[in-house]
């Protein structure tokens, strides 16, 4: 009897060891969560219309409010010159005296939204911002917020916007602004993988200039014009200065004066004859 008990005990000990080994070698069905970077909700294709999204997956409230405001502005009265773009356009409000001095006579409207990429402007166009309006001239400046996209993608986004403007506003003329320089040199470093000997660190402004080279080819000398003020915004050493762009991205009042002065001859020519046959007092922005 004692012998049988010892044998049973040995059997159960062996069975326990085997079970433990099996469990140890079997991967758990639930693995520990791994940390991943949160996906940018606004990193979609530059030429596919998309609203600006908030962090919680909803349309950004400020973006939507501005969009609805612009639609209401279009219904409020005639627009002679329409400015369309991102924060650089929106922040004409920081140089309102310059804006009014140059454009008040042309019944202007400012449809700029801070942070907009090309895909966001496409969504705005597709959702009614250009419906029912007939501006004499549209001034388009967009693309700097697509800074980290490939240059070909930035151009495709701009080109699609340009095509849609012409489709929606067949009688309007268009001034395509070249994307402005940005950064102090150190903040523009990008990893470019196109080199055969491996990735190179490049100045991202080179990419923006390549986009501008493509945009310039769309100038037909008549209905569609291209204006590049890149060099006018830089000093003699090819650098941005804080009196022109305090944050190396958004123009100061002096920067907006440079833009306005450079564009005025082209705009006056494209707006002529002015005033239009039917004019109605309307809000400037």
Task: Please report, for each region that a protein language model flagged, where it lies by residue.
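Structural recognition of the beta-strand scaffold that forms the well-ordered cores
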Residues: 80-85, 107-112, 136-142, 173-178, ...
């Amino acid at each position: 009897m004692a012998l049988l008990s010892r044998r049973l005990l040995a059997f159960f000990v062996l069975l326990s060891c085997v079970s433990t080994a099996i469990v140890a070698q079997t991967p758990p069905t639930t693995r520990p969560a791994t940390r991943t970077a949160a996906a940018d909700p606004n990193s979609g294709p530059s030429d596919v219309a998309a609203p600006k999204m908030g962090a919680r997956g909803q349309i950004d409230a400020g973006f939507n409010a501005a969009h609805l405001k612009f639609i209401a502005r279009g219904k409020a009265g005639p627009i002679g010159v329409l400015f369309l773009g991102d924060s650089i356009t929106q922040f004409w409000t920081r140089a309102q005296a310059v804006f009014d001095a140059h454009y008040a006579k042309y019944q202007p409207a400012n449809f700029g939204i801070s942070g907009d990429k090309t895909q966001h402007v496409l969504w705005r166009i597709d959702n009614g911002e250009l419906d029912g309006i007939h501006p004499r001239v549209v001034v388009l400046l967009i693309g700097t917020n697509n800074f980290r996209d490939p240059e070909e993608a930035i151009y495709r986004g701009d080109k699609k916007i340009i095509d849609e403007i012409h489709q929606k506003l067949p009688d309007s003329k268009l001034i395509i602004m070249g994307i402005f320089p940005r950064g102090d040199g150190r903040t523009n470093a990008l990893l470019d993988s196109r080199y055969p000997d491996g990735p190179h660190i490049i100045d991202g402004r080179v990419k923006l200039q390549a986009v501008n080279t493509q945009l310039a080819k769309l100038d037909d000398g008549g209905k569609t014009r291209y204006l590049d003020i890149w060099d006018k915004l830089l000093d003699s050493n090819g650098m941005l200065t804080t009196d022109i762009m305090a944050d190396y991205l958004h123009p100061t009042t002096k920067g907006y004066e440079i833009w306005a002065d450079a564009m005025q001859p082209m705009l006056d020519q494209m707006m002529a004859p002015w005033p239009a046959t039917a004019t109605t007092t309307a809000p400037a922005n």
